[in-house]
Amino acid sequence: AILLVDSFVGDGSFGFGIFERIFAMPTFTKAITNTLKVGFLVGILSALLGLLFAYVEVYVRVGKFVGGLFKVVSMLPVVSPPFVLSLSMIMLFGKSGIITRFLLGIYDNSVYGFWGIAVVQTLTFFPVCYMMLKGLLKNIDPSLEEAARDMGASRWKVFTSVTLPLMLPGLGNAFLVTFIE
């Protein structure tokens, strides 16, 4: 908002000089680059993790306990605020973390960088992808997959030639929603 006001008020005329000065700053360029890197990485990882959880829930037969555990684990980040997940990562995997220091004996671990942010953001946002992709997988016509199986296709071939192409718009949507968040 201040940039917009300065672009009008600066010398009395509207101009883009203030924006040129801001975009020329190396720290601003680095911040934008890091933001885009984190966004793309988190979008891709969240979509893949959401796809994995949705696929297992819809297609894989698991016991009631494992299925219930899967649902709880996938929905837990939705009901807890993101700062709780961040704090949990710090308490478990930080320099004095329970897992890093006491179980693994690692004393110089840092979760405050690029990868720590990417992991926490992925764990925070993948349930959104999971819910979107689960609905998509449930609505795929099973007769299309059965026809491919009847023609002799393996499970992998059915997934790559029937299921995945039908899911590509939903995967793109899940990526974009996560990237924007």
Which ranges hold each PLM region?
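Membrane-water interface segments at the C-terminal ends of transmembrane alpha-helices
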Residues: 1-12, 26-138, 162-181
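A short amphipathic helical element positioned immediately N-terminal to and/or at the very start
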Residues: 14-23
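Charged/polar positions on well-ordered alpha helices
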Residues: 41, 149-150
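Short glycine/proline-centered loop/turn elements that form peptide/ligand docking sites
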Residues: 140-143
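Glycine/proline-centered hinge or cleavage motifs at structural transition points of membrane proteins
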Residues: 151-152, 165
